[in-house]
Design a protein with these regions (language model features):
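N-terminal Sec signal peptide and the immediately downstream disordered periplasmic leader
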Residues: 1-102, 108-114, 226, 281, ...
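Membrane-embedded beta-barrel scaffold of Gram-negative outer-membrane proteins
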Residues: 337-343, 349-365, 537-553, 560, ...
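Acidic, small-polar-rich N-terminal luminal/periplasmic segments of exported/outer-membrane proteins
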Residues: 66-204, 578
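Outer-membrane beta-barrel translocator/receptor signature
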Residues: 146-148, 160, 169-178, 183-252, ...
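Outer-membrane beta-barrel domain signature, strongest for Gram-negative TonB-dependent receptors
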Residues: 260, 266-402, 408-409, 589-591
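Gram-negative outer-membrane beta-barrel transporters
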Residues: 57, 400-402, 454-457, 461, ...
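C-terminal beta-signal and adjacent terminal beta-strands/loops
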Residues: 600, 699-707, 727-792
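Structural signature of Gram-negative outer-membrane beta-barrels, strongest in the C-terminal barrel
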Residues: 275-280, 392, 406-408, 440-599, ...
Length: 792
């Protein structure tokens, strides 16, 4: 199959299949020899070529024999191809056909099908990802803060959350790995990892054209294809996608003239070119380029309580807002990727994976969401990184080994202007801005190995370790300017930014022996992260496993530093798991995992001082807390008949605070419900004019906090219903899908801001900027969309 390309929205072209293929059979999709099942892909904007055409007669016969039975699902969680049921890791795997049947159109919807998982769009953005698994992640996307959940595209690490809310094309499967992945995947995977596994190009010239129309004037066009330049040897893949949708709401009032008033809209294009070379059966090369540009408007929040500085009422719709900033926003992503793979013999495979990524994101975030400049934050994010990885994977009869060397070099920089214009005017100035600029740059290398040894035909042991050495350099300029300042000239029409640096450097190194900071701060850390596991295969259908693993989130510097404060140590998670993976019958699968972990040296940004007086505030980053959690996860599949299948996923987590030096104090887990539940039903109707697949899905999330130190914004428990129907022609060339999301039009919070004070009686008072800023951002309302595609 053709290689996939990722954009900042997720679409999965449907794979053609015989009418005889069961849902579970299609979901598993064939995964070839390890040499042919892994391909590296660049980070955000990757489009794919068209999927392969109908299976041959033998495949149809095999599929017919498998109807009504569970099928083998293959995963690469341990960087080698193996059965899901034989992999001692808590994994949710969603195949390309299943993505299409459920109508999954964006990465954040994957959270519905994985227990104890949160994947949401970050606050005032359209494409920045907030990810938590088992309560471990990172909410603030500012440069310098490291994620707690790793995002990978065929083993290429996506370092920053900007642009990570991806749409997919022709992905073979998505794997959600729960629990620390510190041995094979390295830093910043204390919660787990999300993997995109894609296909390589094979076969003849293929094209795929797909169009989607839907609610809020959704109109998407995707054209992808592959051309064999030399038969079975050299392939050229190209793709283009244009994704558009009007806003779910609007900016009711914009203080600036000539602004686009769409709120929660979508406007994105992506393109790619890929060259793949197969010189022999044992040797493979690929080079790719991709680019994405997302010009969806900045997202305006919903005021949960009225402003005390304006007379603007709380809007009727949670998707309506007010702003005093420009409404434009941009995310630009561009990247290159390289892959070389050589199968030395039947037991040994060597691989090199390399990538270079660049991203630039100027954006406007109105924290107070009023027509006045009470608390406005225009900001820029500017990142680039290079990665290199060499792998050597050995597979013997009783012994296997995955090993490698990894190098990462990344620069993460930015600039934001916290404009407190109304407060500045009250002080007799034309305005007031706290400007912060800086960089947090990282260079790290790692060596890792994980071996598995079969002690007997039933008992296996696994032992792994990774050593990581990392150096970070950082500088911060931070200070007050008694005027309203924007990042560059013409940020708003007619604005001219003064020349030079407006605020002093406060974080760095004094190299001249005086009080002037003229070099970046430097810190180095190293971590040894082990894993020990034991697996017992009781019989062909049942495996018990237990493991201890460790992961860490990188140490860093405070990107909002106001003084020359030291860096903070890495966060460390020690996790224990026990579980069972069992096929109880040919039609019933049940996987259960119990886990507990200790989370030490939690990095926490605390705000000290008078919240209403920005000149008195001090934000310090500290290792300020230690927590623990325990929980359970259940995933079950029942193939009730040849054409009917049910899937259940349940997650539970119990949280404990063991040490709490945070200011304000820690009170709970952010964006993590105590209970999550999903029930999915899939029915395949076989007709003379093609297959029709009906899908119904119910998803439940318990109540949860938006912030870990405040209960002012929290979401009550809610349930969501999604319905889909997909038709595919007998020949497999035409397909169409009708999808209804959030059928009951539930309103649910996914982010917010709480710059407000509250007295003992529950009355709200002014916070930073002088207003009662309590803002919520919401998930998508009810939508309906129709997709029609043609392959040739």
């Amino acid at each position: 199959m053709s290689q996939s390309i990722l954009t900042n929205s997720l679409v999965s072209p449907y794979q053609p299949h015989s009418a005889a293929v069961s849902t579970e059979k299609r979901k598993s999709a064939s995964v070839k020899h390890p040499m042919h099942s892994l391909c590296a892909l660049a980070v955000a904007s990757v489009l794919s070529t068209a999927p392969a055409f109908a299976q041959d007669g033998q495949a149809n016969a095999d599929a017919e024999a498998q109807k009504g039975k569970l099928e083998r699902i293959e995963v690469t969680a341990r960087k080698t191809v193996e059965s899901l049921q034989e992999t001692p890791v808590a994994i949710t795997s969603i195949g390309a056909v299943e993505l299409g049947e459920k109508g999954i159109s964006v990465l954040t919807e994957v959270q519905q099908f994985s227990p104890n998982t949160t994947l949401q769009t970050s606050r005032g953005t359209n494409s920045t990802l907030t990810a938590f698994i088992r309560g471990l992640g990172q909410q603030d996307p500012l440069w310098g803060y490291e994620p707690g959940v790793g995002i990978y595209v065929d083993d290429v690490y996506i370092a920053r959350p900007q642009g990570a809310v991806l749409d997919l094309l022709d992905v073979q499967r998505i794997e959600v790995l729960r629990g620390p992945q510190g041995t094979l995947y390295g830093k910043n995977t204390i919660g787990g990892a999300v993997k995109y596994v894609t296909k390589e190009m094979t076969g003849d010239t293929q094209m795929n054209v797909e169009a989607t129309v839907g609610s809020y004037s959704q109109r998407d066009i995707k054209v992808t294809g592959q051309i064999p330049l030399i038969e079975d040897t050299v392939y050229l893949g190209v793709g283009y996608a244009n994704l558009n949708r009007d806003g779910f709401g609007e900016y009711l009032v914009s203080a600036l003239p000539n602004q686009d008033k769409e709120n929660y809209n979508k406007d994105l294009w992506a393109a790619r070119v890929t060259l793949e070379v197969h010189p022999s059966e044992d040797l493979f090369f690929r080079i790719g380029w991709d680019k994405t540009e997302d010009t969806s408007n900045a997202k305006g929040g919903y005021r949960l309580i009225p402003s005390i500085l304006t007379d603007a009422p709380v809007p009727d719709s949670v998707f309506d807002s007010y702003t005093s900033l420009p409404t434009w926003n941009k995310v630009e992503l561009e990247g290159y990727n390289w892959l070389a793979r050589y199968r030395v013999n039947d037991d040994l495979e060597l691989k090199y994976i390399g990538s270079h990524r660049e991203s630039y994101s100027p954006t406007n975030i109105d924290f107070d969401n009023t027509p006045l400049p009470i608390f406005d934050v225009p900001a820029e994010y500017d990142d680039n990184n290079d990665t290199h990885e060499i792998q050597a994977n050995y597979t013997g009869n009783a012994f296997s080994l995955v090993s490698g060397l990894y190098f990462y070099d990344g620069e993460s920089c930015g600039n934001f202007d916290a404009i407190l214009g109304v407060l500045g005017q009250s002080l007799g100035a034309s305005g007031l801005t706290r400007e912060v600029t800086g960089c947090n740059n990282s260079e790290s290398w790692a060596a890792y190995a994980q071996m598995n040894y079969d002690v007997t035909d039933k008992l296996s042991l696994s032992l792994g370790a990774r050593y990581t050495d990392e150096e970070k350099t950082a500088f911060v300029n931070n200070g007050l300017v008694f005027a309203n300042v924007y990042p560059y000239t013409d940020w708003i029409d007619g604005y001219v930014r003064p020349d030079g640096q407006l605020v002093p450097q406060v974080l760095g190194t004094d190299t001249d022996g005086d009080e002037v900071l003229d070099a970046p701060a430097v810190e180095s850390w190293s971590r040894f992260t082990p894993r020990v596991g034991v697996e017992y295969q009781m019989d062909r259908d049942t495996m018990f496993f237990a493991s201890y693993s460790q992961g860490f989130k990188s140490g860093t510097f405070n990107p909002r530093a106001q003084t020359n404060e030291p860096g903070v140590e890495p966060e460390v998670v020690d996790s224990f798991e026990v579980g069972v993976k069992s096929d109880l019958t040919d039609a019933l699968r049940m996987n259960i995992t119990l886990f507990s972990y200790d989370h030490k040296d939690r990095q926490y940004i605390g705000v000290e001082g008078d919240l209403s007086d920005p000149t008195a505030l001090d934000q310090r980053l500290r290792n300020a807390a230690e927590t623990a959690a325990k929980g359970a996860e259940l995933e079950m599949t029942w193939v009730a008949t040849d054409n009917l299948q049910f899937d259940v996923a349940y997650g539970y987590i119990d949280f404990e605070i063991k040490k709490n030096n945070a200011i304000p104090p820690l009170i709970g887990l952010a964006s993590t419900p105590e209970n999550t539940f999903n029930l999915n039903a899939n029915y395949l109707l076989e007709t003379s004019f093609g297959d029709i697949t009906f899908n119904a899905n119910y998803y439940y999330r318990d109540d949860y906090l938006i912030f870990e130190t405040s209960d002012l914004i929290q979401q009550d428990a809610y349930g969501m219903v999604n319905l889909s129907a997909r038709w595919e022609s007998v020949e497999g060339d035409w397909y169409a899908g009708l999808h209804v999301k959030n059928l009951t039009d539930e309103e649910y919070l996914v982010g917010g801001y709480d710059f407000v004070t509250q007295d003992d009686d529950g009355n709200f008072g002014p916070g930073l900027g002088g207003d009662t800023t309590l803002i919520g951002y919401y998930g998508d309302p009810r939508t309906v969309h129709l997709t029609v595609g043609y392959r040739f």
